[in-house]
Amino acid sequence: MSIALKQVFNKDKTFRPKRKFEPGTQRFELHKRAQASLNSGVDLKAAVQLPSGEDQNDWVAVHVVDFFNRINLIYGTICEFCTERTCPVMSGGPKYEYRWQDDLKYKKPTALPAPQYMNLLMDWIEVQINNEDIFPTCVGVPFPKNFLQICKKILCRLFRVFVHVYIHHFDRVIVMGAEAHVNTCYKHFYYFVTEMNLIDRKELEPLKEMTSRMCH
C-alpha cells in the first residue's frame, strides 16, 4: 500500500476497534494467509479457496473478522460525508433500500438514516464476533451448528456497506486516492462469498454491472 493510502487508512479512521487472533494459533496462521491475499500480484480468485486439509469454519471465521475490520475501515474514511442529511435512508441508489431489524429495539424492518444503520450494523457484528459461543478463540472449542448461517447474515449486511459506499460515496474514495485499495477489498470479498456460497445471488444484484467488469 502506498504512503498516501496508509495515511487514508490509518488507525484513527477505524470505525470500530479491530478484533485480532492470538499469535501461535491455527486461526492466526489462517488469518495471515488470508491477509497475504491483498499483496499485489496475488490471484484473489485462487487465494480464497479453502486450503487443503483446513476446516471450513475456521477459514470462514478468519475471513469474516478480516472483512469486518477492512470494511469498517473503508466506511470510517467516508463516514464524515455520510450524514442524516446526505443519506436520510440507508440505500444503494433508488432501487435498493435497506431496513434494519434486530432482536432488540427494531423488531420489524425499519427505514433508518445510513449513519444510524451503519452504527447499528457495526455494533451488531461486534457482538457476534466477540461472542465466544459463536466465534470461539480457544483451539478445540467447536463452532455452533448455526455458525455458517450467522456468517451469511454478517456478510450479507457487510455487502450493503460496499453498495452504499460505491453508489453514494465513491467520489470521496477517489478524491482520497483510495479507489484501488477499496476495489481490491471488494474483489477479495466478492470472490470469497461466491467461492464459499455465503451470499444469495439476489443480494449481489445492486453491484452486478460493476462486478462483471471488475471480477472476471
UniProtKB/Swiss-Prot annotation:
Residues bound to Zn(2+): C82, C87, H164, H169
Cross-referenced SMART domains: Mob1_phocein
Alphabetic keyword roster: Metal-binding, Zinc
One of the protein's GO biological processes: regulation of hippo signaling
Superkingdom as given in the UniProt entry: Eukaryota
Zinc found in the keyword field: yes
One GO CC term, this protein: nucleus
Protein name per the record: MOB kinase activator 3B
GO molecular function, one term: metal ion binding
Function: Modulates LATS1 expression in the Hippo signaling pathway which plays a pivotal role in organ size control and tumor suppression by restricting proliferation and promoting apoptosis.
Keyword Zinc-finger: no
Any single Pfam family the record assigns to this protein: Mob1_phocein
Homology family: Belongs to the MOB1/phocein family.
